[in-house]
Amino acid sequence: GALTVGGLSVLLSYANQYMKPFNDISSVITEMQNALACAGRIFALLEEKEESADPAGTIDTVTGNVTIDDVAFSYDKEKKLIENFNLDVQPGMRVAIVGPTGCGKTTFINLLMRFYDVDAGKVCIDGKPIDKLSRHALRSCFGMVLQDTWIKQGTVRDNISFGKPDATEEEIINAAKEAHSWEFIKRLPKGLDTVLSEDSISQGQKQLLCITRVMLCLPPMLILDEATSSIDTRTELQVQEAFDKLMQGRTSFVVAHRLSTIRNASLILVMKDGKIIEQGRHEELLEKKGFYYNLYNSQFQAS
């Protein structure tokens, strides 16, 4: 009963052939699991409610009066996120929105831009309900700089002039200087004609490009969501000065996580659980020694 080398070779060959179907089955099951996961996302997208029809309403001249009348909204109909929300913002006001994570700050911005429709109440710009305006007309009223930056595949010029395709080179350069992005742009291999990819510049440089877009378009109203979060301290001070200049005479909404950046706001809204629990200027809220007072002091103690 001795096993020869030839017999061992045949045995191993048969064993390999025997295991091959099991390996194939395992691979098929893995592929099926991946396909089911992909299908789940596709079906979830197909089951989403269709976006409501876009009306043809426009605004010729925007003064910047924003009114929010008894607005309610929730992502999950079983759990209210924003309810009984009322606000009257006069033209040129600088409104800061603060509060703990999940209180509804970003949701408020999404409703203002009509990324979502309100469940109840209405939002008006210069007296016109935003659901009567075309989305293009509404969103053209605002310039946005968000914490999460977005750069498209293309040149620096394309990324800056995204909202104003007919901008001249002089206008682009002036906007870049205002946003303090020109220093790094002119050091790129081809300057404004350098082709960008997602990883070709730093997060801070991406944020400066997003700020430059707004400086170029000069919209009638601004939305800033921690717009300088990825920028070094020295550049942040310079950009903040540029923003202060840009916000003069423009209605501005500033979502703030660092409370030191909103001391000069015309109105500070303190949100919690989807409701405004305090509002006023910085000094007034500190004197009340309420939620804002504790939030403000906790940041400085932590730092």
What is the meaning of each model-derived region?
Residues 17-45:
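Cytosolic ends of transmembrane helices, especially the final helix of ABC transmembrane type-1 domains
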Residues 1-13:
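Membrane-water interface of transmembrane alpha-helices in multipass transporters/channels
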Residues 54, 60-303:
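ABC-type nucleotide-binding domain
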Residues 32, 49-52:
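Signal-transduction coiled-coil helices of two-component systems
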Residues 5, 52-54:
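Short, charged helix-helix connector/hinge segments
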Residues 44, 51, 161:
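Conserved E/DxxT/N motif and adjacent residues on the DHp alpha2 helix
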Residues 12, 19, 139:
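Conserved catalytic core of two-component sensor histidine kinases
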